[in-house]
Amino acid sequence: MRHYEIVFMVHPDQSEQVPGMIERYSATITNAAGTIHRLEDWGRRQLAYPINKLHKAHYVLLNVEAPQEAIDELETNFRFNDAVIRSMVMRVKHAVTEASPMVKAKDERRERHDFASEANDDSEAGDSEE
């Protein structure tokens, strides 16, 4: 089986349906004896340019190993689902399992914020002891 990287963008008004979509598309891959190596929900993000007069979309990234029939079924589902405003399926040479740069940057920001919060908590605790 081949490895694919799949990104699809969902209409921002349909963001609450994204978990169901992810579940449905994941089931399509696993039912066809495929494997999901990485699944990332990037959330609602600003678009580089308007698509159908929209300026934001909900992004989802999948790295999968699946047969061609499963990929064809996914592309058909994307095409006929009005909530999916754009999708892209690319074949890649190897399975990608590490976190994407988007998630790494988000984790770094979270760690910095947590570290800053801990530093503030420590300084406040030191002030109250005096």
UniProtKB/Swiss-Prot annotation:
Keywords: Ribonucleoprotein, Ribosomal protein, RNA-binding, rRNA-binding. Signal peptide: none annotated. CDD domains: bS6. Residues 119-130 have a biased composition (Acidic residues). The keyword RNA-binding applies. The keyword Ribonucleoprotein applies. It comes from the Bacteria. Belongs to the bacterial ribosomal protein bS6 family. PANTHER family: MITOCHONDRIAL 28S RIBOSOMAL PROTEIN S6, SMALL RIBOSOMAL SUBUNIT PROTEIN BS6M. This is Small ribosomal subunit protein bS6. It comes from Yersinia pestis.
